[in-house]
Amino acid sequence: MSVVKSDLTLFAIPKNFHGHFATIQRNAITSWTRLNPRPEIFLFGDEDGTAEIAGELGIRHFPEVARNEFNTPMIDDLFRRAEQHATSPMIGYINSDIVLTDEFSLAIGHLHKRHEKFMIVGRRWDVDWDRSLDFSQPGWEDSLRAAAGRANVQRPGNCIDYFIFSRGLCNGLLPFALGRFVHDNYLLWLARSRGAALLDISPVVMAIHQNHDYSHSQAFADVRQSPEVRRNRIMQDPGGISTRSRTPRKFCVKMERIGRIDTGG
């Protein structure tokens, strides 16, 4: 039986696999390995447990990634390394607590055939989940979707947990600190400024975020006032990057919302 090669490489940089984070990250990363066709998957960073789960799931692990003086990964180096090692035409950054199902593969495969240069994003659905997913059960996807549907918390457009893009689109990024605001809007602006189709698959893909606390970092309010956030905001100032809105703290771009995936033809 021949194996269909995926056109997608997913990459992530997990947090330490401690406590609840160990459970939800294992759930998420394992779900990626079950996509059909299975994507190439890279895990970056030397956080506790990353090497072990990479070995267990047959995932490539790259412990080295550039960090700032606060030990925060830098997106320019992270994205550069991912593209350097990827063998596929589509590359995607994803947060390591996001569970994906085959509707995701269907959507991006469809759009890849129709766009040469693109960035695909989507809003997440939040759900409280504190146990391991049983992937041996044929209905695991439906059970998780049902739980997310009951919670009925689809986050707004500023909560983007995955960015799927055509190869070469994200070359030469600015050195933003990962997870310190601004960089997600910057990626959207960059895609549009480079002539890419910006595609929102939220209506057709339920990307499920397993809720967690923020014990891995400073309190949310403290992070917003941190030197890293201030530095990120300075880099996105419109004096250096022109935006259509000229709004100093926000990149305004228009996205095409994908409301239906036609599987015929």
Region spans (language model):
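Short, acidic, metal-binding catalytic loop of nucleotide-sugar glycosyltransferases
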Residues: R26-P39
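Well-ordered, non-membrane alpha-helical segments in soluble/globular domains
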Residues: T23-I29, S105-A107
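A short, glycine/small-residue-rich beta-strand->loop->alpha-helix junction that serves as a flexible
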Residues: N16-I24
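Short, hydrophobic beta-strand segments that form beta-sheet elements in well-ordered domains
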Residues: P39-D46, I120-V121
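Conserved catalytic core of nucleotide-sugar-dependent glycosyltransferases
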Residues: E83, V99-D184, L188-W189
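Short, solvent-exposed loop/turn segments at secondary-structure junctions
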Residues: K15-F17, E47-T50, N68, D97-V99, ...
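Active-site-proximal specificity loops/subdomain of glycosyltransferases
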Residues: L43-I94, T101
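C-terminal catalytic/acceptor-binding lobe
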Residues: S2-V4, L8-P14, F176-G265
